[in-house]
Amino acid sequence: MKKISRKEYASMYGPTTGDKVRLGDTDLIAEVEHDYTIYGEELKFGGGKTLREGMSQSNNPSKEELDLIITNALIVDYTGIYKADIGIKDGKIAGIGKGGNKDMQDGVKNNLSVGPATEALAGEGLIVTAGGIDTHIHFISPQQIPTAFASGVTTMIGGGTGPADGTNATTITPGRRNLKFMLRAAEEYSMNFGFLAKGNVSNDASLADQIEAGAIGFKIHEDWGTTPSAINHALDVADKYDVQVAIHTDTLNEAGCVEDTMAAIAGRTMHTFHTEGAGGGHAPDIIKVAGEHNILPASTNPTIPFTVNTEAEHMDMLMVCHHLDKSIKEDVQFADSRIRPQTIAAEDTLHDMGIFSITSSDSQAMGRVGEVITRTWQTADKNKKEFGRLKEEKGDNDNFRIKRYLSKYTINPAIAHGISEYVGSVEVGKVADLVLWSPAFFGVKPNMIIKGGFIALSQMGDANASIPTPQPVYYREMFAHHGKAKYDANITFVSQAAYDKGIKEELGLERQVLPVKNCRNITKKDMQFNDTTAHIEVNSETYHVFVDGKEVTSKPANKVSLAQLFSIF
C-alpha cells in the first residue's frame, strides 16, 4: 500500500488524528482527537476524485440519501474536536462519521448515504462549529442582524422594538402588541429569534399574557425597577410556563442589596446578565452571584478581554445607554459605581475557571453585536498567555480550554434558554446551523454560514467574473436568504403555551416556529465545561475579588489576538 506524509495527507483531506491546528493568530492549539473517515476511502469531490457515481456515490435513490454532505470537516464542538463527514437532510444534521456509498465502501451507515440527490461541500482544511447564540440583544436596529450573522451568530435572543429609549437601555419587548410586531418583523431575516418580555411587573396576569403572546421568557431590568417583588412574580410565572428569566440587577441598591436579590430568587434558576457589573447590577458585588448553583452567569463583550482601554471607553457608553446626563452629579456617580477595574480584571479569570458560563454582546447598548465570538476567543488566548495551560488539559494541546470557551456562546446559552434540543452544537438530529472557518481566520471571519442546511452567507467574489474567487471578495447573501427559502431555513422560538395556542397561525407567520423547553429544572451543573461553583466575595472598599478566599485578578492586555491584523481589508 502506498503511503503519503502527514503533510501531504492534510493538504488533500485535512488534518487527521494527532494533527494540530492553530486557531487564528492565537496561542490556542487544537489537536484532532479522532478521525471518523476511513483511510483510503475518503470522500473527495472534483475531477478525477472519488465522490462520483459508482464510486462514493450510490446510483440508487433512497429515502436515506443526503441533501448535502460536508466532507472531511474538522468539527470543533463541546462534544469533541474530531474529523468527520457531516450529512445534512431536511435541514438537520442526519449523520456524522463516514459518508459515501454503502454498497461500495466499508463503514458507511444509512444516515450518511451519498446518492443522486446529494450536493457536496468540501470541508477538508476547514473547521466547522455550531452557529453562535447571543442571548443579550437590544433590538435597536435591524442592521444588527446581518452584522451578527456575518460573525457566525445564527440565533439572537433579547428584546426591544427599535431605537426607543426603553430598548436602548433594556432587552425587553413589552406586551402583546409589541411582541406581535417583533414576531412578524422577524420573518425577514436569516437568523433564529427569541424575544424576552417585561418581567418588571408584580402582576401574574400581565406576565402570563406576554408569555402566551409568544415571548420565550422575561427580562428584569433595573431601569424598569428590579425589585424583590418583581423578581419573585416573574420567577413564579416562569416556573408555571417553563421559560427563562434574565436579570439586570439594581446598581444603586435602591430596593435591596445583592443578598436581598438572592433571597427573592430563593434558589430558583436565573440567567444573570453582565454578571461582572460594568454593564449594570448591584455595586460593587454583583459578581459574587456567579458562584451560586442556581445562577447561569453571563458576560457581555465590552469588558472581555480586559485591556488597557477597557475602563476609559465605558463612561461614554454608559451615559448614552442609560439616558444619563454628565451635568448631573448623581448620574456621574451612578456611572462611576459601575466601572470598577478590579472586578473587570477578575472577570477574565473567572471565565478561565469555568465560573462564568456564557458570553453575549449587549448589542448597541454597551456591547458590539459582531464581536461575541471574536472576544470570547481573545479572552481565551489572553488567559493562556497570562496563566498558561489549564490543569485539565491532556496532551500537548488546548482542547479543554477550546471546548470551555466554545461552549460559552454555543451550547450553554442554548441550554439556558431551552433551545438546546434544536441548536447549539454539532450533533445528529439538530438543525444544521453551521459555521465554516479557515483555521487562519477562525473566530474572526467565517468562510461560509449554513442556515437550516442551506448556504445563507458566503465570502464571494465578483459576480461577473469567470470563476467565484476574483476580487472584490466579501460577504454576500446566498439563496437561503431569499424568497420563501428563508422561511424554511430559520426559526422563531416561542413559549410552549404560545405554540400550543397556535401563535404561528394567529400571526400568519411563515417561518418555522418551535417551543422552548426545559428552562426551569436546570442549574449551573448543566453548563458544559463551565459549571464551577464557588464562594465569591468582593472587598467593599478596594473592590478586589476573592474566590474561596483567594484573590483573583488579571492584567490588562495592551495587545490582543484576532484584531487589526485581520481587518486590513
Curated annotation (Swiss-Prot):
List of residues binding Ni(2+) 2: K219, H248, H274
Positions of modified residues (N6-carboxylysine): K219
Reaction(s) this enzyme catalyzes, per UniProt: urea + 2 H2O + H(+) = hydrogencarbonate + 2 NH4(+)
Cofactor: Ni cation
Enzyme Commission number: 3.5.1.5
Superkingdom assignment: Bacteria
One of the GO biological process terms: urea catabolic process
Stored SUPFAM superfamilies: Composite domain of metallo-dependent hydrolases (SSF51338), Metallo-dependent hydrolases (SSF51556)
One GO cellular component term: cytoplasm
GO molecular function, a single term: urease activity
Cofactor: binding details: Binds 2 nickel ions per subunit.
Pathway in which this enzyme or protein is active: Nitrogen metabolism; urea degradation; CO(2) and NH(3) from urea (urease route): step 1/1
Keywords assigned: Cytoplasm, Hydrolase, Metal-binding, Nickel
Posttranslational mods: Carboxylation allows a single lysine to coordinate two nickel ions.
Compartment list: Cytoplasm
Annotated residues for binding of substrate: H221
Name of one Pfam family that matches: Amidohydro_1
Residue ranges of domain Urease in the record: 131-569
Enzyme class: hydrolase
InterPro entries in alphabetical order: Amidohydro-rel, Metal-dep_hydrolase_composite, Metal_Hydrolase, Urease_alpha_N_dom, Urease_alpha_subunit, Urease_AS, Urease_asu, Urease_asu_c
Keyword Lipoprotein in record: no
UniProt binding sites for Ni(2+) 1: H136, H138, K219, D362
Record-linked HAMAP family: Urease_alpha
Family: Belongs to the metallo-dependent hydrolases superfamily. Urease alpha subunit family.
NCBIfam families xref list: PRK13207.1, PRK13985.1, urease_alph
The protein's name in its UniProt record: Urease subunit beta
Origin species: Helicobacter pylori (strain HPAG1)
Gene for this chain: ureB
